Amino acid sequence: MPEKVRAELKTIIRNRALEVGFDVVRFTTADPDPLNAKALNEFISQGRQGDMAWLDNKNGRRGNPLALMPEAKTIIMLGANYGPNIDPIEIQNNKGKISIYARGRDYHDVLKKKMRKLARWLAETQKCGIKIFVDTAPIMEKPLAQKAGIGWQGKHTNLVSREFGSWLFLAEIFTTLNLTPDLAETDHCGSCELCMKACPTDALAEPYRID
């Protein structure tokens, strides 16, 4: 596929994704990511995953998108903003707080509906193979999002977007389309440690490491 055609197709896909309700659309390759897979294995070997048994990576699937779809060439990374209109830290200081993401409808259901609409259109118009994922498969979403240019993993280990901060739900479409990847994002945290100071459980003993 000529580069001009690939660029035009990316624009068409991006516009369609925005139409169905996503706020960020980026593209990256489906290549394995051994560096981040190694970091995850070290995290698990130190027992820092707690009772999150689903993070297990013994079969090596995390960090290797091709284990989920061997024929995939491109991953379309999608982000949906769920940021509130008010600062949740400054309200109801004398009451227990429920995480913003849990105050509305289950985001898995919301995003899957949007993704199915987008994926159906993509499969019908481009005659390509696709698979969709919304935080339910062994995928290292944050490293993929950084590789696609959506944002970077901050010192709190969450994804940070220049436009949306850390208020993004992530989802992916794996496809056999061979599209030009976007540029990866770089770390812009610098000397800032606001997230570490704000952590209510002091789980961030050092930058980029959550206990």
Describe the residue ranges of each PLM region.
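Auxiliary alpha/beta "docking" domains used to position bulky ligands
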Residues: 1-188
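Iron-sulfur cluster-binding cysteine motifs and their immediate structural context
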Residues: 19-22, 32, 194-211
